[in-house]
Amino acid sequence: MDHLPIFCQLRDRDCLIVGGGDVAERKARLLLDAGARLTVNALAFIPQFTAWADAGMLTLVEGPFDESLLDTCWLAIAATDDDTLNQRVSEAAEARRIFCNVVDAPKAASFIMPSIIDRSPLMVAVSSGGTSPVLARLLREKLESLLPLHLGQVAKYAGQLRGRVKQQFATMSERRRFWEKLFVNDRLAQSLANNDQKAITETTEQLINEPLDHRGEVVLVGAGPGDAGLLTLKGLQQIQQADVVVYDRLVSDDIMNLVRRDADRVFVGKRAGYHCVPQEEINQILLREAQKGKRVVRLKGGDPFIFGRGGEELETLCNAGIPFSVVPGITAASGCSAYSGIPLTHRDYAQSVRLITGHLKTGGELDWENLAAEKQTLVFYMGLNQAATIQQKLIEHGMPGEMPVAIVENGTAVTQRVIDGTLTQLGELAQQMNSPSLIIIGRVVGLRDKLNWFSNH
């Protein structure tokens, strides 16, 4: 270990930055956030430093560097574009046993600045020892995505509860289980973020007083259309916290690779015309796992409330009194159209968009007359097997046969395939494609040749 990671208490302690440019400004923000009593020395300053000085947040010393500026300091940073001056600052600090950071010169510094994830009072620092700052930044970004934005407020609140929790729960095991519940409770985090004291109190009392082996909860998470990069930040956090993940065929392997390693995985994949697991059985799986006290994520392709039968699953949980929440996802219509260069709406071609399922309950019939109207875009989910019928019905109800159409297979994935043509060709085009596919019908499809960006990557 080349460097010892430490967290310094700098509040109301004298610190010095030598340098008045953009790099010095970034360092100054960190020291000000830490409550340091900051002096900045430079020949000239960018406007932000002047604004801070006018607000009484720091002291500016304009002119050449003088070693006496270090006499009362606990910490110094050399952040000029003059290597000789930076070295001089470092040597003067070293002589006074003051830790000094030299920007972009780790070998000349007695300490280095890590990449920081600030969820105060929770702080995470990532460092490559100065060998690869870009790698440290990339790791910080990945960790940022895993830590909820309001986690710091929850951590601070937890500190206020420690005494009561110690009284309420006799053993370390019980306390640990309580804290695990508290830190993953979305309602408490949101209540703290909104400063909703009533909700904070209610949620806290519920968490403290309910049995530790209480019923679990189910989180319905939309996985998006395929590309793992389109999974929402909150969706990622939920699958990282799950005890059980119940998922279907439309969830990509890349997304499943993000699931917590020790979580149980239950595949309930379905295909058009063939159900691996009946819907009622899926409902019972969710219910059964939650009743064991587990945190269950029902992971569904696209958005769970758009042709995902999410509402049916939640009704079962609601009737059984199981707590649940929903994390929406990017629906296939948005993802597939964007990755195919087809805007769903356009001032010249479409003032509305219709999302339509290719599957209806027995006896169901679509309003084909309204669907055949101009100035709109139609998006058919699960319509591949019904493409010939869709073609026939729309033409019968007045849609022009030359209306542009596109079919998107495996939308947003690296294996995405798009085929386009006219409405009179739709049934024939569908025979060339495989599920999962999405059908898009409307004048906006004609923009695809101009706006198709994804196939060029």
UniProtKB/Swiss-Prot annotation:
Residues 1-204 are annotated as: Precorrin-2 dehydrogenase /sirohydrochlorin ferrochelatase. The modification Phosphoserine is found at S128. This is Siroheme synthase. S-adenosyl-L-methionine binds at P225, G301, G302, D303, I306, T331, A332, M382, G411. CDD domains: SUMT (cd11642). Then it catalyzes the NAD-dependent ring dehydrogenation of precorrin-2 to yield sirohydrochlorin. Finally, it catalyzes the ferrochelation of sirohydrochlorin to yield siroheme. PANTHER family: SIROHEME SYNTHASE, SIROHEME SYNTHASE-RELATED. InterPro entries: 4pyrrol_Mease, 4pyrrol_Methylase_sf, 4pyrrole_Mease_sub1, 4pyrrole_Mease_sub2, CobA/CysG_C, NAD(P)-bd_dom_sf, Siro_Cobalamin_biosynth, Sirohaem_synt_dimer_dom_sf. NAD(+) binds at D22, V23, L43, A44. The active site is at D248 (proton acceptor), K270 (proton donor). It comes from Shigella sonnei (strain Ss046). GO terms for biological process: cobalamin biosynthetic process; methylation; siroheme biosynthetic process. Keywords: Cobalamin biosynthesis, Lyase, Methyltransferase, Multifunctional enzyme, NAD, Oxidoreductase, Phosphoprotein, Porphyrin biosynthesis, S-adenosyl-L-methionine, Transferase. GO terms for molecular function: NAD binding; precorrin-2 dehydrogenase activity; sirohydrochlorin ferrochelatase activity; uroporphyrin-III C-methyltransferase activity. Its EC number is 2.1.1.107, 1.3.1.76, 4.99.1.4.
